[in-house]
C-alpha cells in the first residue's frame, strides 16, 4: 500500500515495512551545539508529537463514538498551525501561514480517510489527494531551504507518515492492538524522534529535519 519513490541510493532502511532515508544532514557546527539549539529542537519535537498523534486521537474519538470528535479535529488543526508558526522568526508570517495551512489540509484529508475506513469505503481517492498536498508542501519547504530540505526526502517522509496513520486506523478498526502499537511507535519515529545514527544506519525525523535545517541555514542566529 506504500507509494514507492525511487532515488539513487546505495542502501535502504525500513521501519515496519516503510522505507526511510538515512540521515542526510551533516553534524551541526560546534558554535551552535548549545542549550539554545537543544531547546529549539525539543520544542519542535513537541509540536510534531501533538500533530502526528493528534491524527490518532481523532480516530480514537471517531471509532469510539465520542460525540466531540469534531473538537478533536479542531485541536488537530491548531496543532498543524502551531507547527507552521514555528517558522515565523526565520521565514516570516506568510511562509508560516502557508506551511500551517498545508499541514491542516493534510490532517483534514486524514480525517476523511479515517471516516472512509470506518464506513468500509475505498480510500484511493484520498491517497491521491494526500500525494498532491504532500508534493505542494515538500516543494514549498525545499524552496525555502534547498540545501537542507531536499524535496524527495520530505516527500518520502510525509508519504510514510500518512501511510502509518492509515495503518493505525486499520489496526484500531480491527482491534488489533499489536499492529496498533507497532504503527504508533513508527509514527513517533518518523515524525519526532528518528533513530540514532549508529554507524550511519539511523534516520532522521520530520521534526529534526526541519529544526536542523533552520539551524544549519542560519547558524549565527543560534550562536551564544
Predicted regions mapped to residue ranges:
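C-terminal amphipathic alpha-helix
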Residues: 16-17, 24-30, 34-69, 73-76, ...
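Serine/threonine-rich low-complexity intrinsically disordered regions
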Residues: 2-15, 21-23
Amino acid at each position: 500500500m506504500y507509494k514507492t519513490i525511487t532515488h539513487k541510493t546505495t542502501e535502504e532502511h525500513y521501519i515496519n515495512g516503510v522505507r526511510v532515508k538515512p540521515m542526510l544532514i551533516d553534524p551541526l557546527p560546534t558554535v551552535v551545539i548549545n542549550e539554545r539549539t537543544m531547546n529549539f529542537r525539543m520544542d519542535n519535537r513537541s509540536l510534531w508529537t501533538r500533530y502526528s498523534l493528534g491524527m490518532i486521537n481523532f480516530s480514537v474519538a471517531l471509532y469510539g463514538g465520542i460525540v466531540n470528535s469534531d473538537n478533536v479535529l479542531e485541536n488537530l488543526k491548531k496543532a498543524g498551525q502551531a507547527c507552521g508558526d514555528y517558522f515565523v522568526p526565520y521565514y516570516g508570517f506568510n511562509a508560516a501561514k502557508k506551511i500551517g495551512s498545508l499541514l491542516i489540509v493534510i490532517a483534514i484529508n486524514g480525517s476523511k480517510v479515517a471516516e472512509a475506513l470506518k464506513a468500509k469505503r475505498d480510500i484511493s481517492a484520498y491517497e491521491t489527494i494526500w500525494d498532491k498536498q504532500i508534493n505542494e508542501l515538500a516543494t514549498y519547504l525545499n524552496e525555502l531551504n534547498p540545501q537542507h530540505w531536499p524535496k524527495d526526502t520530505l516527500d518520502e517522509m510525509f508519504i510514510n507518515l500518512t501511510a502509518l496513520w492509515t495503518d493505525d486506523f486499520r489496526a484500531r478498526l480491527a482491534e488489533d492492538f499489536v499492529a496498533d502499537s507497532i504503527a504508533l511507535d513508527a509514527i513517533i519515529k518518523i515524525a519526532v524522534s528518528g533513530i540514532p545514527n549508529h554507524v550511519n544506519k539511523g534516520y532522521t525525523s520530520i521534526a529534526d529535519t526541519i529544526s536542523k535545517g533552520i539551524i544549519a541555514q542560519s547558524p549565527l542566529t543560534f550562536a551564544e
